[in-house]
C-alpha cells in the first residue's frame, strides 16, 4: 500500500518506505526531549551572537542533493534542500548559514532563543534519504543585571538604620545575599518578580543594622554562573568629648554668676551713693538753719516741726 507523507512544511515528498519515515519522526521527537545528551553546550548573553556547530565532516562527493535541517526542539529554524536555503519567520534577518560546515549563526540573541538545537544531515542513497549525521547543541542565554543600587530607607528606631538594595533586567532567576565580613546577614522584605513578556527579573531586599558601630555591607546577586554586587559603608557619627558638655554648663553658670554679682554691686553702689548724697544734703540744710535763726529760734522751729 502506498504511503504519501510530508516531512515538514514546503518540503518535497519523501520517497522512501513508511517504516523509515516513522523512524525519522521518532528521531525528531527524541530531539525535542533531549536535555543532557548533547554534543556541546554554549552560554551567551542577550544581544550577543552565537555559532552553533554541526560538526559534520562531509566526504568529497556531490552535496547538491543533501538535506540539512536545523531545529530547536520540535520547531524548524532553517532547511537546505537541493541547495535552496529556507529560513523560518521567527529567525529571518537574524540568522546566517555556513554551507561549508553546515553551522548556524544566530544574531541578536533573545531569551526565547535558549534551548537545544539539532543539526540533521540526510543523504540520498539508493533513491531514499537516510540520516547520516546528528549533532545536538544546548544554548543557554543570560541577561546581566544592572549594578545594584543601595539607598537608605529610614530609621526604624533610634539606633537602627534600614537600607534597600535593588537591581533589574537579569536572567536567569537570581539568588540574593546580604554579607558582612563574609558572614550572611538576615534580610527582610526580599522580593523577586519576573516580567511576563521580557522574562527578565527584578529583585529588591532590605536590611536593618545597628548604627552604633561601623559597617561595610555587601549586596550580592547571583544568577547562573554570573554575579553582581555593591558595597555600602556606614561610619558611626563622632561623639562629643566627655567633658565638653560639662565645660559648657560650668562656663554658662560662671558667666551668669559674674553678671549677677556685677549687677548687685552696681545696685549697692548706686544706693550708697544716693544715701550719702541725701545725708550731705540734710547736714547742709541744718547748718544753714543754725546760721539763719540762731540757737533758740532754731530750737523753737524744731519744736514746732515736732
Curated annotation (Swiss-Prot):
Membrane spanning stretches: 247-268
Protein name in UniProt: T-lymphocyte activation antigen CD80
Domain Ig-like C2-type: 148-229
UniProt xrefs under PROSITE patterns: IG_LIKE
Residues in compartment: Extracellular: 38-246
Tissue expression from the record: Expressed on activated B-cells, gamma interferon stimulated monocytes and non-circulating B-cell malignancies.
Gene3D superfamilies referenced in this protein's UniProt entry, alphabetically: Immunoglobulins (2.60.40.10)
Function: Costimulatory molecule that belongs to the immunoglobulin superfamily that plays an important role in T-lymphocyte activation. Acts as the primary auxiliary signal augmenting the MHC/TCR signal in naive T-cells together with the CD28 receptor which is constitutively expressed on the cell surface of T-cells. In turn, activates different signaling pathways such as NF-kappa-B or MAPK leading to the production of different cytokines. In addition, CD28/CD80 costimulatory signal stimulates glucose metabolism and ATP synthesis of T-cells by activating the PI3K/Akt signaling pathway.
Amino acid at each position: 500500500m502506498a504511503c504519501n507523507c510530508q516531512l515538514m512544511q514546503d518540503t518535497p515528498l519523501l520517497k522512501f518506505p513508511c517504516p523509515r519515515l516513522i523512524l525519522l519522526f521518532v528521531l525528531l521527537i527524541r530531539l525535542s526531549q533531549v536535555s543532557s545528551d548533547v554534543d556541546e553546550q554554549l552560554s551567551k548573553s542577550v544581544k550577543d551572537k552565537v555559532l552553533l556547530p554541526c560538526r559534520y565532516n562531509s566526504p568529497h562527493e556531490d552535496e547538491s542533493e543533501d538535506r540539512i535541517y536545523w531545529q530547536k526542539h520540535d520547531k524548524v529554524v532553517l532547511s537546505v534542500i537541493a541547495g535552496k536555503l529556507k529560513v523560518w519567520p521567527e529567525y529571518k534577518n537574524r540568522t546566517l548559514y555556513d554551507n561549508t560546515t553546515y553551522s548556524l549563526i544566530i544574531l541578536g540573541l533573545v531569551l526565547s532563543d535558549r534551548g537545544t538545537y539539532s543539526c540533521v544531515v540526510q543523504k540520498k542513497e539508493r533513491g531514499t534519504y537516510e540520516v547520516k549525521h546528528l549533532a545536538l547543541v544546548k544554548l543557554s542565554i543570560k541577561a546581566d543585571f544592572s549594578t545594584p543600587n543601595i539607598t537608605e530607607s529610614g530609621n526604624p528606631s533610634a539606633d537602627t538604620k534600614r537600607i534597600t538594595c535593588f537591581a533589574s533586567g537579569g536572567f536567569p532567576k537570581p539568588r540574593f545575599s546580604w554579607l558582612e565580613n563574609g558572614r550572611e546577614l538576615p534580610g527582610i522584605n526580599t522580593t523577586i518578580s519576573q516580567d511576563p513578556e521580557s522574562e527578565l527579573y527584578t529583585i529588591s531586599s532590605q536590611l536593618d543594622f545597628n548604627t552604633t558601630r561601623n559597617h561595610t555591607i555587601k549586596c550580592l546577586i547571583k544568577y547562573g554562573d554570573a554575579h553582581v554586587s555593591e558595597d555600602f559603608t556606614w561610619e558611626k557619627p563622632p561623639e562629643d568629648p566627655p567633658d565638653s558638655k560639662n565645660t559648657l554648663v560650668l562656663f554658662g553658670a560662671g558667666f551668669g554668676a559674674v553678671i549677677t554679682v556685677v549687677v548687685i554691686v552696681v545696685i549697692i553702689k548706686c544706693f550708697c551713693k544716693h544715701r550719702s548724697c541725701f545725708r550731705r544734703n540734710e547736714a547742709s540744710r541744718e547748718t544753714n538753719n543754725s546760721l539763719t535763726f540762731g540757737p533758740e529760734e532754731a530750737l523753737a522751729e524744731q519744736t514746732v516741726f515736732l
